[in-house]
């Protein structure tokens, strides 16, 4: 069984169809690449898989659980995240403030604290640097953030 499946997804921006029935699967331990020209839909596919966009059709099972109706922040808690190219951090804010920006719409303070601890467990360097300005982090540290 595949760890991740993308089954015949169709994604639109308004009336414009951006993705026309893309399918692929990723087995555990497998690495794949999305290759295509500028504007071919690579980023749209990744945004859809990570919950930033919702397909009009198709399914995206991840470890047996359908992702299409799950909000992006919950997909992250399942262990999948989209790390965009570039280092889009708030340079004048601390690491901790940057992380908290990702939770600004969430109300459950206990859940936010647990999520923050999970991030720090996965990225101990960020915990060490939580009070440091994000703009002063190395490139790799900014990608972690």
Please describe what each predicted stretch is.
Residues 4-6, 19:
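Conserved structural motif at the start of ABC-family nucleotide-binding domains
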